[in-house]
Structures are given as C-alpha cells and as structure tokens.
C-alpha cells in the first residue's frame, strides 16, 4: 500500500496539473517505492562529494550508487532506478528536494514540497510537461517525503504492478 504522505504528495501534483488543464498521472506503486527508497537514502546517507546533488544514490542499498552532478553526466543512474528496484522496466525521471545526508530543519509536507517545485522552472516544467518535457506523456507517478527530503518520479510507461 502507498503511504499517506506519499499519496498526499502525488495527489497534490495531480491537483496542480488539473489546475493547468492537464490529465492526472496514474499513481504508481513501483515509482512510489523508488521515491520512498530514495528519500530514505538521501536522508540517511552522507554526501560522498560536494558536487553530488539530490539525484545521487549512496552505496548503502541494493542499487547502483552514483554521484549525480550538475552536468547530468550520470543521468542513466537516475533513469535506470525503476528497472533496478521494481518490475517497472521503464525510464524514470526524478525531481527532488534535499541534499544527501543534509537536513535543512524544514519538515516538508505536500504543499511545501509542491510549492518548492512550482518555484523552480526546471522542476515545474517536468510536472506540467513544458519545455524539454512537452512531448512526454506521463503514464505513472510516484512520490516520497521524509523530513526535509522529497522526491517525485515520472515515467512515460504505465506501471504493470497492481
């Protein structure tokens, strides 16, 4: 089952999309698992280098670790996580709040997380299929939120997991 906080964040994203005339994205158990796994990893694993951003993954789990840098050289590390961790054999795209191993002191909830993404043009574009993302049709959405970390995952493939 999808946790209440994850569901609240996914529903907030879909409500925001509806305000812009966009269809809701089906909420995915698989992508929610990826998102919740990643927020827990971000919260509990220290940054391995200053250049590693919130798309980074530690070596502390059953996944391929990576230091995700601003040049997107490690994009495949993000894209492959749904296939690594779930039955959803699809490319995943992530928006995040929070750095590895850092706690801001702000306890996020769905409205705060969504507001942060709305205030960032690059993240807002992913949610609303604008710019780089205008040709994508999101067919699955997952979310996770723990303390000062939040993730939302998007894929153009439907989740086969019931």
Enumerate the language-model features and the residues they cover.
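Functional surface patches built around histidine and acidic residues
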Residues: 1-162
């Amino acid at each position: 089952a999808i946790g209440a906080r994850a569901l609240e964040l996914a529903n907030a994203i879909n409500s925001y999309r509806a305000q812009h005339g966009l269809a809701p994205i089906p909420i995915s158990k698989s992508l929610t698992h990826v998102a919740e796994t990643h927020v827990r990893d971000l919260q509990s694993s220290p940054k391995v280098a200053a250049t590693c951003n919130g798309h980074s993954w530690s070596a502390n789990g059953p996944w391929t670790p990576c230091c995700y840098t601003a040049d997107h050289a490690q994009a495949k590390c993000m894209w492959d996580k749904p296939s690594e961790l779930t039955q959803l054999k699809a490319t995943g795209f992530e928006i995040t709040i929070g750095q590895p191993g850092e706690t801001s002191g702000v306890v996020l909830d769905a409205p705060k997380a969504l507001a942060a993404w709305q205030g960032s043009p690059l993240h807002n574009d992913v949610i609303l299929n604008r710019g780089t993302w205008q040709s994508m049709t999101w067919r699955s959405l997952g979310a996770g939120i723990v303390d000062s970390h939040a993730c939302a995952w998007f894929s153009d493939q439907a989740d086969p997991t019931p």
